[in-house]
Each structure stands twice: as structure tokens, then as C-alpha cells.
């Protein structure tokens, strides 16, 4: 298995929110592009559901980060197997 460490470190609240939000926005745009390039209703619904899930998860994570009020440890690893 191959892996890529994208993020590893301690960040301020605003830095953590910025970096995580940026990554989630890239993933949302990926799903939006998939919607644009398909006419299959089932695929569109799956992409829309995933976008909503990402938005909800990001909102919850932002609340959690705000509640901590200190440096936040963030790790993001992509593993390909």
C-alpha cells in the first residue's frame, strides 16, 4: 500500500478551519463536476448526497474546532491500496 501524508501538524483554530475547508471544497467541486458530466439520475443523487454529507461534516467539525480554543492537531493521509 502506498500513502501520502497531506497534512501533519498543529494549527491555530483559523488555520485548521482554513486548511480543512479548502480540502473539503476541492472534494465538493469534484462531485459537482461529476454531476455536470452525467445525465444518470441515480449518479446525480449519489453525488448530491455526498456533497450534503461533506457540508454537514465540515459544519460539525468547525463547531468542534471552535470549542477547543487552542492549537489543533490535524493529520490527513491518503492511502492507496
What does each model-identified segment do?
Residues 1-81:
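Extended, charge-rich alpha-helical interface modules
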Amino acid at each position: 500500500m502506498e500513502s501520502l501524508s497531506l497534512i501533519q501538524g498543529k494549527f491555530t483554530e483559523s488555520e485548521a478551519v482554513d486548511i480543512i475547508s479548502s480540502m473539503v471544497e476541492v472534494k465538493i467541486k469534484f462531485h459537482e463536476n461529476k454531476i455536470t458530466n452525467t445525465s444518470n439520475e441515480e449518479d446525480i443523487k449519489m453525488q448530491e448526497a455526498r456533497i450534503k454529507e461533506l457540508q454537514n461534516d465540515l459544519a460539525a467539525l468547525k463547531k468542534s474546532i471552535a470549542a477547543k480554543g487552542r492549537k489543533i492537531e490535524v493529520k490527513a493521509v491518503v492511502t492507496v491500496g
